Swiss-Prot record:
Reactions mediated catalytically: 3-methyl-2-oxobutanoate + acetyl-CoA + H2O = (2S)-2-isopropylmalate + CoA + H(+)
Gene designation per UniProt: leuA
Domain Pyruvate carboxyltransferase: residue ranges: 8-284
Protein's UniProt keywords contain Metal-binding: yes
Binding residues for Mn(2+): 17, 208, 210, 244
Protein name: 2-isopropylmalate synthase
Cofactor: Mn(2+)
Places the protein is found: Cytoplasm
Main location: cytoplasm
Record keywords: Amino-acid biosynthesis, Branched-chain amino acid biosynthesis, Cytoplasm, Leucine biosynthesis, Manganese, Metal-binding, Transferase
Record bears the keyword Amino-acid biosynthesis: yes
Amino acid sequence: MITSQDRVIIFDTTLRDGEQSPGATLNIDEKLTIARQLSLLGVDVIEAGFPYASIGDFEAVQKIAEIVGVEGGPTICGLARTTRADIEAAGKALKPAAKARIHTFIATSDIHLAYKLKKTRAEVLEIASEMVAYAKTFVDDVEFSPEDAGRSDPEFLYQVLEKAIAAGATTVNIPDTVGYTTPAEFGGLIRGIKENVPNIDQAIISVHGHNDLGLAVANFLEAVKNGARQLECTINGIGERAGNAALEELVMAFHVRRQYFNPFFGRPPESETPLTNINTRHIYKTSRLVSSLTGMFVQPNKAIVGANAFAHESGIHQDGVLKNKLTYEIMDAQSIGLTDNQIVLGKLSGRHAFQSRLQELGFKLSDEEINKAFIKFKDLADKKKEITDWDLESIVNAEIQQPPELFRLELVQVSCGDRSRPTATVIIRTPNGEELTDAAIGTGPVDAVYKAINRVVNVENDLVEFSVQSVTAGIDAIGEVTIRVRHEGRVYSGHAANTDIIVASAEAYLSALNRLYAVLQRGVEKINLPKDQPTEVVAGS
């Protein structure tokens, strides 16, 4: 349980609130991959999901709790409404974690009470107290959120928080659910809580905010100045609607402006002690991983991690930066994991140089993964003169994200043009070693390839997302393809990278189908959940 008030606690909700971004659905393996990277990044708490929302969410939270929530690792958190069924599901899913937290919430604004909950203030007070106490029977660490706190009556909010803390809440989280407040208002709200909740010193004050007015990060910084010590944020700021407060922006604000923020933590301005536990050199890699797995591209002018964040086009700026970086840059690109000395590899580079560079970039791979990635590297080197760090990241990320190779693409060939019908031929090796060839006609080359693959694999599915991103500049750049298919309500994703977009598209599609086929082979394991568990629930905090 985290009780420190002398630093900022980073609570990452990429896997819960971030995944509620339209089109950002992740499967269990992808969530686990991100959770592992968040642990390396140094986040204090990972909100791994909403266990009662679906069987898939339950499985993901349980697996992350078991594999990432080890001794010395982050606290693993599960979201739950203030109902016994929700809290019971969260408690069961979190059981394997060394440090577990249940995060339970109920709305407190008058508009939510009247139209959503249809309950009185007295009823909400009773429910909050009772359900926090129930959550304490599963874990010692309980977080309580009054949903839509930003629009709640302050006096009622103080009462709810006092009751929740008295019932055992160790963290009270103040959400600006609809991104409505301004920094001055949000800072005042936190200050009011510090001054008017009698037992507030028994809990950590946390904040959660959305970016509907573009003020989430500014609101959080003001909240910290007024006593908040936990910040709920997401990588790249992904989340519902306009997103959440961006982890990388908050962390680097405390890193760059440490002298300004130190006094608010009772430190002398010149103190060099970091204000967070984040290893900032993992920020860029984490951003790229989340972008790749969710298929949500980072806008070029995004603060900290955007492609243009350290770019200078103005001649005056370029001249200044060349003479001294501090003239126009307030932080070192290396501090977030970007390197100035990009080592360029080529077809004459050997396995040792390849492996050494991967280690320098922070990748920890098994011998088998290195061998597979090296084969991809040599294949790429025959097509591309210079291979950059970004290319290497793409190769490795595509390799480590691959499922068991049940179906293997041996050949893909397409014919298309403005006066011909797109046609594709594929040769696929099946799980029993047989090579099958088929062809199909489509509305475009990718459609034709997918139809040909479907004829061989013969697993019913709906393609729900297809996205392509260029890794580097240039006509010979690698293209990363992310696709998602749906089968019986479940979503399966595939990723691939290649200088040939058609090949990458075929490999990504087959990757998703391999995941789907593997699940069909082993069957979906049944989980002991409450009988009335729904297929899907949308969280509101």
